[in-house]
Amino acid sequence: MGDKKTKVVLDADVINHFSRGGRLSLLPNILPEFQFIVLDIVKKELPILILADLDKVIKQEKTIAEEVFGGTSGEKKEYFRLTATSGPHLGKGESACMVYCRYHNDVVGSSNTKDITDYCKQYGITYLTTNDFLFYAIQRSLITKEEAV
């Protein structure tokens, strides 16, 4: 049995960026050493056309997997703390991604650095932005600098 791959847990903004650029199916190929997933909570935030593009990648290409968020009571409690109006009041998608990665030692894929940076630093969570993915795609000759603009 193979080693379990670290997951990149994609937030809506990264999915949006790559889908609108016509490159969503490229995303998992940029870092094939990782498993790419999207949480059910994040899917609910996506516009219908982006969701259709994502569903194609999930169902036909099978390079991004969908997972249900909230496997443990600790995850649920932390998620509600982050999204509560009396707490940091962060978005549902990025909160779910960060909590999932905190509890599973995975990587957040989000460009919403304003909302994720402090939490990720506090809990030692690695995160990658759209620009990071584009950088690696260029470095690995999957796209040109001109295509990344």
Q: Which role does the model predict for each range below?
A:
Residues 116-149:
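Acidic, PIN/NYN-like endoribonuclease modules and their adjacent C-terminal/linker elements
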Residues 110-111:
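Short beta-strand scaffold positions
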Residues 2-100, 104-106, 117:
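Active-site-proximal, substrate-binding regions of enzyme catalytic domains
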